[in-house]
Amino acid sequence: LSNEQNAAPAIADMSDQMQIRLEKRAKLLESGRQAYPVGLLDAQGGRIAPDHIADVRAEYDPKLEAGELTAGDETDHVVNVAGRVVFVRNTGKLCFASLQAGTNGDRIQAMLSFNEVGEQSLADWKSLVDLGDHVYVTGRVVVSRRGELSIMVREWRMAAKSIRPMPVLHKDLNEETRVRRRYLDLMVRPEARELVKKRALITRTVRRVLEDHGYIELETPVLQLVHGGATARPFRTHLNAFDQPMTMRIATELPLKRAVVGGIERVYEIGRVFRNEGVDSTHSPEFTTLECYEAYADQYVMAERMQEIIVACAQELGVTAIETEDGTIDLGGEWAWLSVYPGLSEAVGVEITPDTPAETLREIAAKHDVEVNPAWDAEKLVIELFGEIVEPTLLNPTFVYNYPPSAQPLARPNRDGSRTIEAWDLIIGGMERGTAFSELIDPVIQRERLTEQSHKAAAGDDEAMELDEDFLRALEHGAPPMGGLGLGVDRLIMLLAGEQDPERPGTVVRQPGIRETILFPLMKPEA
């Protein structure tokens, strides 16, 4: 045994418990056993696939419930089970342990008796095994005297020695620790594992709905020479191979539209985007979006797609209602449409139109305690006033539409000539969940808008888009009329994947923050 294998490493936060566990690891190695074996092997060195705890329970729990097996019964069925030790009780000649394995956190009791495993093996169990260790056990399926399905162990082996103690749920796992060390959260909290499964179910459902409509999933570049597709501040990096400054994508829009120009007429992508902006309970620097584009569709078709996606996800999770501090969200009712200018006018008691001067809007902002930038023009002021005054009041699903043109430089002018654009934001529970446009495909107007954006960028606006000549070149080849949709996947999960009331199945009573929905969110380094 090499000194390197047996030496205790220098760990900055070494505790007495960790030191004891390292000594147990050393004893395992000194005795010729492995603390971290490659797997469970037979005498000839062949791999033995462990039996899943869930499968053992699925076979025998119904027999217990039906009375075919009762307390004290034994079977001749020998199983090989692997799991993490989450409970242990050692007595004289009989030891008990709960083993946990699988995404569902399935558990089964292991019983080690002097008669079955022998004196030395039982002594080793008592002296070498701690909470948090992974172990292999081989033995017969039995029912304990207390009526609990168990494995009467005849042989055990270490699968992975835990050096750090398992956390105590309420003592060691505050909210900050749960987010920073998600592996601990997953280890001890079933709710954390359940949220991971719900997230996976939601993304599968989104894909299914789109693919049922003939969409094809694409993968587009994360590193970009020109940032665009949204108004947001990008992360900047440098490609050494080309000695070229680049940015991380803030949206997937422009490459997906290029694909539609090329003839892939229904496309989507679910992927991470990166925005170098604020961090709070609803915003993360990196987050997951869905974007999809459909030739010969418009904002109304995309509204149908959005509603179908969200309702399908709710149905998969069994969600029928979502309770908030402001009331109950009903996804099954009518999804309303609210035009920006009339909606804001009603909220402030003053008629606001595209002709309302910026000075009047600043006076309204001051009256309603809305902070504004003196450099903002009238369109920007309308957008901010609506977002601060009206948006938080929209509880049930509402498509907010007829925005001023500067809100979305990639949306087409409204067909009714109202000096607005064909774009909507979906607001649910006072929060934007997604957006869609009738896409701007006129390359002349698009060049004008992106040129205006590039001038803002050159003047120091970090959120303005840059002029993407290749995207404009694609539009100049002729893009079909199309609708486009963007959905914040994390915010959809926040809406639907919260804890449900056990007394009222289907009613979500607590919505998680964005840091809970992202498995490993970006966190400020610990001091």
Model-identified regions with their sequence ranges:
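Class II aminoacyl-tRNA synthetase catalytic cores and aaRS-like
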Residues: 1-527
